[in-house]
Amino acid sequence: MAASYSVPSMIMEEERRFEAEVAEVQAWWNTERFRLTKRAYSARDVVALRGTMRQSYASNELAQKLWRTLKTHQANGTASRTFGALDPVQVTMMAKHLDTIYVSGWQCSSTHTSTNEPGPDLADYPYDTVPNKVEHLFFAQQYHDRKQREARMSMCREERARTPFIDYLKPIIADGDTGFGGATATVKLCKLFVERGAAGVHIEDQSSVTKKCGHMAGKVLVAVSEHINRLVAARLQFDVMGTETVLVARTDAVAATLIQTNVDTRDHQFILGASNPNLKGKGLATHLSEAMAAGKTGPELQAIEDNWLGMAELKTFSQCVTDAIKKMNLAEYEKQRKLNEWMNHSSYEKCLSHEQAREVAERLGLPNLFWDWDLPRTREGFYRFQGSVEAAIVRGWAFAEYCDLVWMETSSPDMVECTKFSQGVKTLRPELMLAYNLSPSFNWDASGMNDNQMMDFIPRIAKLGYCWQFITLAGFHADALIVDTFAKDFARRGMLAYVEKIQREERSNGVDTLAHQKWSGANYYDRVLRTVQGGITSTAAMGKGVTEEQFEEKWTRTGATNLGDGSVVIAKARM
């Protein structure tokens, strides 16, 4: 008879703690925060991936704050408006007026990579680049929050009542590009974002190998299912860390011209194929390979591709069927009946697979219709894709369950597009929050809008559900504009340019960098020194002799100032 086995108490306790944590995670998922969220894994999976030492993250408080902010805007039909911040100066100025902060991959790529090597937005910088910028700004936010508290607690109550409180801790939403590789790369990227201070992250559905700025050409999509895997990987990492980090799914389906694979049936209706039967057999990639082997290069290869594509009569399968029905030798009413039946079965909402669409075409009398999506594939193996708002809507439906907001990247500020996408995606996901890129890549003056329409654009699309709107590169452009105009003026007018265009403007607009020593926290560290040294220090940075006293209202200096050239002026304060 086998001896009975007694489970050690340590093992029992380990299991008890594990099961308690599983129940805790499940209860968390059952809260209102995750009512619309679908997960492809269980609470047991999450707890098994955690360590035994529980950790908390400051970014989670801001993630919860971000969620409340966005849900309030959604309920009110308004929008959180923000832009890409370059540095701590910008993030502290933005805190006075805006309720969220954006960190752009484009801005990081061009101005602040972790290797210090700048370049265009191709997501080829090290993947810690944007998390590092998030940390840079998040540390600044926390520092200025500490600095403000010290300053306010040094005031009497009456002075505090007169001094506006600034919430420096505005939630940061960061650019996660494509997730920087496979699922494990996305997991590690998201871990970095949480640790570095991001309250939200967006991830797009381009190929990580060929990723481009959303307003460049040559964009290649991944399959719907692959991007869902990225979103699942991101959410899993947030769950493992116990955070409510806001996840934004971006789609580039409007302007994309290529897609990596045809493996997902939801993509089938948007893939282009050759409809000219005279090209049956050898594909474009084979023609190009043979031409290269024969010594052809550059313009010659481009001419071969252009000529082949010109003959291919590229169409979606739906367009091919529609054209074939119109050419049938039938009475007009019968053609129209078949067209109506085809459109009823093949509308984009149905998301027919190619095989299903073929079956419908056969029932309509088109059993051997020539259409081939493999023939026009590129040398890299990509399929041709017909980008459209409809393609973005289909992807929005698919992504919505796995994210918190959906962002459709567009090529212009088009109210018709915004309305079409919002109405389309909300037919299946009515509670979905939307994001919109108020891109500086658009020539807004060429958009057809007048000034009033531009001013009303944000509130108008906010009513459609776009509750987070952002200018990706406004920090970059604002920085360039002020430095270029000031440098030009300074070269011409010297110190008058600085005083007139910067110092006086800072004073008249109440910009706190006018007193830059105070802004940088010299008073804060004077208090640190006094605290360390028993309440007194002879080396205080803001003590007697600091030039910043010249910016106080009570300060004035009269008398002669020697200019060094034998002349003197009577100095006076401009207060």
From Swiss-Prot:
Its main location: other. One of its GO terms (cellular component) is glyoxysome. Its EC number is 4.1.3.1. Its cofactor is Mg(2+). Keywords: Glyoxylate bypass, Glyoxysome, Lyase, Magnesium, Metal-binding, Peroxisome, Tricarboxylic acid cycle. Pathway: Carbohydrate metabolism; glyoxylate cycle; (S)-malate from isocitrate: step 1/2. GO terms for molecular function: isocitrate lyase activity; metal ion binding. Pfam families: ICL. InterPro entries: ICL/PEPM, Isocitrate_lyase, Isocitrate_lyase_ph_CS, Pyrv/PenolPyrv_kinase-like_dom, Pyrv_kinase-like_dom_sf. It is found in: Glyoxysome. Mg(2+) binds at residue 175. Involved in storage lipid mobilization during the growth of higher plant seedling. Belongs to the isocitrate lyase/PEP mutase superfamily. Isocitrate lyase family. This is Isocitrate lyase. It comes from Solanum lycopersicum (Tomato).
